[in-house]
Structures are given as structure tokens and as C-alpha cells.
């Protein structure tokens, strides 16, 4: 299934990768140059990043599994004690296989992969897909985490989980974290995320994810929601795990009912 066409400014600041090469890569994913877009996909010597040109004070968005927040979370975070780890059912030696069907910037998936789960990523937005692909390729080369990520974190070349076959592409857990319309205060908490939200917007068709997720999950579907959000599809989960600002709604799979 082809991605819907996305128009965005394409810029190369790299001495190694030309604008023509970036344009050709983007064309494969139906991303075209639009000089009027306030958003730009920029190739630097270090990475691929997304910028909001009309708000230059906002941070660029890019995927970095090696340093920054993710390195801190890997080294000093809760590991198996993290809420997402508990939600997917990590317990003792049990390390479920996971499909993250709304991968985004890959942060929760990275936590699960670093613990030892085998995680497959699906990302529907083509620009985010390229950011994620770029971040993974860089992480795969890292001496410290490259090997474990090559084993445990893989981006699938599909853009919706309804393209996966429940008979062959199943997993123990399907994880969903659809973008939700933010309350104004929470939208301003992480200013760098405003760039991401401007690109992606809310997942208005998020309800369409639950049925294919239930078909793919052998054990459970985990849906991450803001604490004020309604249930996905209006469907009551079997149970929920609550954190300070979010909750994880958990739907047990057919084999667990």
C-alpha cells in the first residue's frame, strides 16, 4: 500500500549526501519538495532531522537511540520496572515479542528492545518512517548498543498493521500509542514535540487499529492513552495500568481470554 503524498521542504546541509539523493530517497516514500511548507526535512552530516522553519527556537526532531534522553533512560531508567515493560507483560524471564504499530520516534520500543524483547516497528507517516530508519541505521553501527538493536529492533517496510498477516506476522503483544488531541497545557510542556505534532496531527482513524491489533496479538494488545482520553473504539479493556499522566489499557488476546 502506497503512502499518501506529503509535501515538505527538502534541504541538504550535508557534505556527503546531496539534495538530489535526499529527493530521490523521499520520492520512494511519496514525499515531495514543497517550498511553501513551514516544515523541512533536513539532511545534515550527522543525521536526518525535521525542523519547523517558522519557529526556529523549537528544537529539531530526530531519532537518537545512542545519546541524550534515550541513553539516560537506558542507563538510569527503570528497565523492567518501567511502566511500559510491566504493561506488555515482562516478568521474570518472560520477554514477549512485540509489534509497535504506531512507532513514532521509537522511544518505548527502544526501552523494550534494550530489555531484551524482539520488537518490530510499523510507522504510518512516511517522514517519521525515514527519521526512524535513519536513527536505527546509526544506532546499528554503535559499538555499545548496535548488536542488541540489530537483534531486537527492526523497522518493517509496511505502513499499517492491516498489511500484516495474522497467520505469519503475529506477536505476543501489539502496542498502540496513537497521537491524541492534546490539551493546550500539555502540548506546551515539551516544545520540541510541537514540531512532530504539526507534522503528524492526531490519529483520527486510531480506532481502526484495534481490530487488526487484536488479530495479530497472541497474548495482549496494549494501548497507551492520556489519562483523560476515552477508550479506543469505546471498548472497555480487560484492565488498565495507570501512571502519572497516562494509562495503559490492556486487552487480552484470544489465547488468553
Curated annotation (Swiss-Prot):
Its EC number is 2.1.1.242. It catalyses: guanosine(1516) in 16S rRNA + S-adenosyl-L-methionine = N(2)-methylguanosine(1516) in 16S rRNA + S-adenosyl-L-homocysteine + H(+). One of its GO terms (cellular component) is cytoplasm. The keyword RNA-binding does not apply. It is found in: Cytoplasm. It is an enzyme of class 2 (transferase). One of its GO terms (molecular function) is rRNA (guanine-N2-)-methyltransferase activity. Keywords: Cytoplasm, Methyltransferase, rRNA processing, S-adenosyl-L-methionine, Transferase. InterPro entries: 16SrRNA_methylTrfase_J, SAM-dependent_MTases_sf. The keyword Cytoplasm applies. S-adenosyl-L-methionine binds at residues 107-108, 123-124, 177. Belongs to the methyltransferase superfamily. RsmJ family. Specifically methylates the guanosine in position 1516 of 16S rRNA. This is Ribosomal RNA small subunit methyltransferase J. It comes from Haemophilus influenzae (strain PittGG).
Amino acid at each position: 500500500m502506497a503512502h499518501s503524498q506529503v509535501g515538505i521542504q527538502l534541504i541538504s546541509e550535508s557534505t556527503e549526501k546531496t539534495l538530489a539523493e535526499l529527493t530521490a530517497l523521499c520520492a520512494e516514500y511519496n514525499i515531495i519538495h514543497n517550498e511553501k511548507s513551514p516544515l523541512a526535512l533536513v539532511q545534515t552530516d550527522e543525521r536526518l532531522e525535521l525542523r519547523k522553519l517558522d519557529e526556529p527556537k523549537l528544537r529539531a526532531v530526530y531519532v537518537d537511540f545512542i545519546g541524550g534522553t534515550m541513553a539516560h533512560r537506558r542507563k538510569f531508567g527503570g528497565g523492567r520496572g518501567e511502566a511500559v515493560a510491566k504493561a506488555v507483560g515482562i516478568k521474570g524471564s518472560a520477554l514477549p515479542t512485540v509489534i509497535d504499530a504506531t512507532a513514532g520516534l521509537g522511544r518505548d520500543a527502544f526501552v523494550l528492545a534494550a530489555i531484551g524483547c524482539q520488537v518490530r516497528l510499523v510507522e504510518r507517516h512516511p517522514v517519521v518512517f525515514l527519521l526512524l530508519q535513519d536513527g536505527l541505521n546509526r544506532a546499528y553501527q554503535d559499538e555499545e548498543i548496535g548488536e542488541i538493536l540489530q537483534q531486537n529492533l527492526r523497522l518493517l517496510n509496511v505502513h499499517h498493521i492491516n498489511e500484516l498477516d495474522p497467520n505469519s506476522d503475529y506477536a505476543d503483544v501489539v502496542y498502540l500509542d496513537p497521537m491524541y488531541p492534546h490539551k493546550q497545557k500539555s502540548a506546551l510542556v515539551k516544545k520540541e514535540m510541537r514540531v512532530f505534532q504539526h507534522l503528524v496531527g492526531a490519529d483520527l482513524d486510531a480506532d481502526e487499529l484495534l481490530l487488526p491489533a487484536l488479530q495479530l496479538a497472541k497474548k495482549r494488545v496494549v494501548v497507551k492513552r492520556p489519562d483523560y482520553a476515552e477508550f479506543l473504539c469505546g471498548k472497555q479493556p480487560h484492565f488498565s495500568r495507570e501512571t502519572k499522566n497516562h494509562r495503559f489499557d490492556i486487552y487480552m488476546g484470544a489465547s488468553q481470554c
